[in-house]
Amino acid sequence: MKLKRQKPKEKFSYDPQKVLKKLEDLAWKILEEAKSGKNPYFDVPTRGLNNVYFDEESRLIRLGDRLSRRYFLNVAHARKFMQTLILMAYIKRLVSEGKHASLREAYYANKHTVPGTRENTFEDQSESDPIIEDLERMLGVLREEMHITADRRGYIYGDIVIKDGEDEFNASKLGTGGWAVPGTVEHIQFPEINVDYVLVVETAAMADRLIEEKYPKRENCLIVATQGQASRGVRRLIHRLHYEEGLPIIVFTDGDPYGWYIYSTIKRGSINLAYLSEKLATPDAKFVGMTMDDIKEYNLENVTEKLKGIPPDKKGGPTGDYKRLIEELNYPWFQDKEWQRQLKLALKWGVRIEQQALANKSLEFVAKEYLPEKIREGKLLP
């Protein structure tokens, strides 16, 4: 199986004016309702599992159409209503001035005592963060497009040229540490791409191993290290590399329920961010490993780890890894027969297999045999 760059499927162009217009349209609506003597309100798409579904056609986890209405003249709603307007004004200022703020900065910048009262606008960041998520769903824009960022996590390494503001550089010439993916990647451009595909790797240790073994150069790929669950910035970057630049996406995680869920969020989206699946998920992604089949295929029985928790057939079970496996067995997006088989084998054997277990063969085994062989022969899970 030869992986190669394909024709781009979409072209993204960040336009701050569109974000400003959506903010202003919503603000004008509230103002007109107040001026006409009506009770101003926001319609907020409802969060939670009961408003999430798996869309078979798009192959994405999506948010349903349930709404909750938040009124100004309602004692139960008034505080959140005020907080929403405060953050809308703050975001408008950020976007207009071309500045960015972290979630923490957004909280502190807008925390103050309401004049004439002893009431604070925000008591804790746990109040401001959900309002920003509400605005994402109400406006249909990413938090990052509103110039609100989170801590950066993850890095990339490979022969692509990145344009970040006034800076332009090749991600294979920044040392073995690569380029750290920022919290927002909306402004990033890719003037030159000289790789055939993207290999997304769960652990930094495995990504470092592949870089040391010259895998990106030899296999002509871009390494994306997620360093655990992929951040929004990393997921958005993967999405853009596939849809805008036509690069196939291959994911490589530990063979356990958490590694498989990392793959699931990259491919299908997540329950918590179902409203952003269309912009963050990449349903064409494929999974190379680790799998339960790898244990037998590569004689790794002696380097497996026991699943954590209590099995379903024991008193108090299932808990831990076992509980997570059963949840995944029941998710609509894990119903493919190959995935069902992998999950059931993990339950039956009661083991997990880490990426680093391949070092039992040799340090270079993963880069020179395991990955090239599986990708070349198309041994990939959907």
Swiss-Prot record:
One family name in Pfam for this protein: TP6A_N
Molecular function, one GO term: ATP binding
Catalytic activity: ATP-dependent breakage, passage and rejoining of double-stranded DNA
Gene Ontology biological-process annotations: DNA topological change
Active site per the UniProt annotation: Y108 (o-(5'-phospho-dna)-tyrosine intermediate)
Function: Relaxes both positive and negative superturns and exhibits a strong decatenase activity.
Protein name in the entry: Type 2 DNA topoisomerase 6 subunit A
